[in-house]
Amino acid sequence: MWKTLHQLAIPPRLYQICGWFIPWLAIASVVVLTVGWIWGFGFAPADYQQGNSYRIIYLHVPAAIWSMGIYASMAVAAFIGLVWQMKMANLAVAAMAPIGAVFTFIALVTGSAWGKPMWGTWWVWDARLTSELVLLFLYVGVIALWHAFDDRRLAGRAAGILVLIGVVNLPIIHYSVEWWNTLHQGSTRMQQSIDPAMRSPLRWSIFGFLLLSATLTLMRMRNLILLMEKRRPWVSELILKRGRK
């Protein structure tokens, strides 16, 4: 198994594999998100308490879920990079960090907009909101560490250590609404009372965000591989082939 993984992690091979998957994932993400958003924003019934303002859920919840999901994936990659010294694992951490940061920012902004009518303010130092803000700072810290060192191996090690330290924040985000008395509503997935006509497009949106994050990660992986391997012969050959086209 590890032999196969190491073979797949060879830069030219991984670059090629990413290229195979990107078009299909991109098409799938556009289709799934289009279905989820048209269904959710256009055809799902209005909420009996919040009216149409609840529809921001189709943007907020997927972004919030995958802001944590991406970080968990980064933690797995960071562990592999630190333990088995796989350069491509460190590269995966660097590839996912900006995407996770954007998803976290979207979750915070949409959450504030959604909470304004109910809380009477754009921001409260609620346990869920504060821990999600900490997650954004962790993403920014990982990005900063990756760019702070010229040595990619050292940069990957430093970023990986920060990622693993920050994992403790994930259960705090998830269980904050259960551990503390917070203003934030309970986890959406736990609320079985939600109307199926609202829940189905939400699931499409969540899956669409997953496909989108995978697409963007693979695109960034290809760019980072080229940047890291820019002095290798295979990159020069690739540039020449593209130039002939």
UniProtKB/Swiss-Prot annotation:
| Location within or outside the cell | Cell inner membrane
Q: Where are the transmembrane segments?
A: 21-41, 64-84, 91-111, 129-149, 160-180, 206-226
Residues assigned to the Cytoplasmic compartment are 1-20, 85-90, 150-159, 227-245
Q: Which InterPro entries match?
A: Cyt_c_assembly, Cyt_c_biogenesis_CcmC, Cyt_c_biogenesis_CcsA/CcmC
Q: Which residues lie on this side of the membrane: Periplasmic?
A: 42-63, 112-128, 181-205
Which Gene Ontology CC terms are recorded? Answer: ATP-binding cassette (ABC) transporter complex; plasma membrane
Question: One GO molecular function term?
Answer: heme transmembrane transporter activity
Q: Name one GO biological process term.
A: cytochrome c biosynthetic process
Q: How does it sit in the membrane?
A: Multi-pass membrane protein
- Coiled-coil annotated spans: none
What keywords sit in the KW lines?
Cell inner membrane, Cell membrane, Cytochrome c-type biogenesis, Membrane, Transmembrane, Transmembrane helix, Transport
Disulphide bonds annotated for this chain are none
The principal localisation class reads: membrane
Function comment = Required for the export of heme to the periplasm for the biogenesis of c-type cytochromes.
UniProt record similarity statement: Belongs to the CcmC/CycZ/HelC family.
Recorded hits in PANTHER family, A to Z, give: CYTOCHROME B_B6 PROTEIN-RELATED (PTHR30071:SF1), HEME EXPORTER PROTEIN C (PTHR30071)
Protein name according to UniProt: Heme exporter protein C
Can you name the source organism? Escherichia coli (strain K12)
Q: Which gene encodes it?
A: ccmC
